[in-house]
């Protein structure tokens, strides 16, 4: 009765190891053959294994708990040892037969930072509701990346009233004076260079139920307007100036966006 287990590990390096684990009837010990030269190792392995162990012994299996044993005896001839150069030639030939994997084409990286949205429609909005007027103003600012930026506004209103939206420097005084709302001081003209680029106003009229008395019908005017300013540098900061006048309500408001939100250079207001 004998049992033999072999584990052969072949590493393609200057040193090749062959580990043999065998439990034999005569000694029951394991042999470990190791050599620094691959050529001498191969010769030593094949000659020793041909003397001590044959294929018939290697394939002989004994199953515990069974009476019958199966033995296979095959004719085995000692192979000719391969040199180290033969192994490297075989490795080179097998590598050449493998087709290289096609590389996936990568899309070129496209920089999308040319147009930088400084403020979106939701960042600035003004909603005014009175008995006779319902007003909503939204705006956004877009930096074009070439030293200029645009300011866009859209305004929807239902009812009667006078609405004015303009861009002013931070030094603009908030006051109920229509004549001075678009005046820019001479000292601010160098740092404030904006002009109207696009403007469109659509108006319509309809009769609806009055807000203050649903039993009555009121004449209402609906207005939708779009306006855009184109500003160029150098500039410090711009503010949005809104003035609203109606028969029962007046409002003047100046809003200066926080430019530290989008600019690497902090803005320190003066005045």
UniProtKB/Swiss-Prot annotation:
A Pfam family of this chain: Neurexophilin
One example GO MF annotation: signaling receptor binding
InterPro entries: Nxph, NXPH/NXPE
Signal peptide: 1-21
Role played: May be signaling molecules that resemble neuropeptides and that act by binding to alpha-neurexins and possibly other receptors.
PANTHER family: NEUREXOPHILIN (PTHR17103), NEUREXOPHILIN-1 (PTHR17103:SF13)
Protein name: Neurexophilin-1
Source organism: Pongo abelii (Sumatran orangutan)
Gene: NXPH1
